[in-house]
Amino acid sequence: YSITLSRSPIRNACKVLFFACLVSVGTLIFFPDDFVRFGILHLLGFGMLVSPFFKSPRVNLLIGVALFFLSYLPLNYPAWALPISGGEQYFSMMDYYPLIPWLSYFFLGLASGQRKYFAAYDQPVTNSMLKLLLLPGRYSLIVYLVHQLVILAILILILGSPR
């Protein structure tokens, strides 16, 4: 929903995709057998990148529903189509969110944000306690990256070196 409020969605998408690439390179170095090839940041970055070109809530709703139902078709994707779907049959990965079906949820959220279903939440927050609760959302990319590093560090301490 917040992508509909952004003043610079392409810049934000590029930032997310940059960190997605860093995650891929980092996991390739430390976990070469299970590295992230197309994870949640790749998915969100791609969705953010294409979202400015889809302005109609109705079209976005149709795309979201179509992508969702497309995921139920028994299609065999080749290994090179990993970002689209079916990569789990070829590779072991720590994090995998293919475009089908996960992009459907992005488009459904985009459609609802464009329809202003959440218009009540567009009001400025004046309560200091609420502002504090909204703070993690403002820095969600940093929160996501840091929590991943903390979890991996704890797992390495408990289970030992990944190699």
Residue map of PLM features:
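Alpha-helical transmembrane segments and their immediate juxtamembrane cytosolic regions
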Residues: 1-163
